[in-house]
């Protein structure tokens, strides 16, 4: 017992001997021998050298198992990491698609404005929000259809669904939320616009399938992406003026075929290998000829829409600038250079903006033209009739 008491009193000098003595399960009395004997006749330095790594590892495990307080900002970092794949799924980091979807809506809203008036800012805000939401929903639908195809294409293999960052079930749940938000925006419009807007959903859903069956998926994309050319006018006026909206819509379809064909040339080698079709493959080396034809059709449609709306000089000047912009794109395009194709595709945001500004300025100028128009002269018969109406009737007494 003397040895035990001595060991307990001197544990700060012999930590490893104390650990060995106190953890022994034997019920036999402790022999009165020096502490060095209890641990196998090793010296303090020998014990420390052999057991120190084990003690350090044990301490590390205990410390790592203790709850640690979160660093400032760690919650935001976790939230960012959790939401980043969904933001990538709806292409928040690449807003060009939202712009290209919004501009036909903005054109239609601006064309429908009364002479001398600015376009309806509330409608522009609603359609801008709707473009952001529905473009994201369209990307989700596209990636759900093309998950296996995207995994085989160099440019798209890192997309959240193709790379496995998001499961198919989670993507469907996310799509439901997107469509619900889109419906919430749509119901802010009149009932004619609600029906017209809902009817475009079929095009949005079927577009990704078209690249499997036809070389013209860009045509279907154009029909879906430019639906706002019809919807914008209906939202502000309660009906669609086909004389103005139909040529505007067809112009937008031609524009989409132009810029999305340029876009599709980035992936044409991968598309050939996996059997995906596109206008880039259909046009081939004659791409510039085809794009020139669609550009001419677009400019013709825009001129027709402007004539139907009694547009003024700024509008037609903008149409001319748009034509020059597209001609420069096509002339300098290198269809075998993916970087150049991407650059030309992105520049189409400027096309939409230029035309929108031309519509706004042309509509504002319409009021001045109306005021400066000479009043029609009265004919002699009309003048005599007017004079007789202004004479006071005789009073019979």
Swiss-Prot record:
It is a multi-pass membrane protein. GO terms for biological process: isoprenoid biosynthetic process; transcription by RNA polymerase III; ubiquinone biosynthetic process. The keyword Magnesium does not apply. Its cofactor is Mg(2+). Its EC number is 2.5.1.39. It is found in: Mitochondrion inner membrane. One of its GO terms (cellular component) is mitochondrial inner membrane. GO terms for molecular function: 4-hydroxybenzoate polyprenyltransferase activity. Residues 1-14 form a transit peptide. It catalyses: an all-trans-polyprenyl diphosphate + 4-hydroxybenzoate = a 4-hydroxy-3-(all-trans-polyprenyl)benzoate + diphosphate. It holds the Pfam family UbiA. Keywords: Isoprene biosynthesis, Membrane, Mitochondrion, Mitochondrion inner membrane, Transferase, Transit peptide, Transmembrane, Transmembrane helix, Ubiquinone biosynthesis. The keyword Transcription does not apply. Disulfide bonds: none annotated. Pathway: Cofactor biosynthesis; ubiquinone biosynthesis. The chain crosses the membrane at residues 96-116, 121-141, 169-189, 190-210, 213-233, 242-262, 289-309, 313-333, 345-365. Its main location: mitochondrion. It is an enzyme of class 2 (transferase). Catalyzes the prenylation of para-hydroxybenzoate (PHB) with an all-trans polyprenyl group. Mediates the second step in the final reaction sequence of coenzyme Q (CoQ) biosynthesis, which is the condensation of the polyisoprenoid side chain with PHB, generating the first membrane-bound Q intermediate. Belongs to the UbiA prenyltransferase family. HAMAP family: UbiA. This is 4-hydroxybenzoate polyprenyltransferase, mitochondrial. The lineage of its organism: Eukaryota, Metazoa, Ecdysozoa, Arthropoda, Hexapoda.
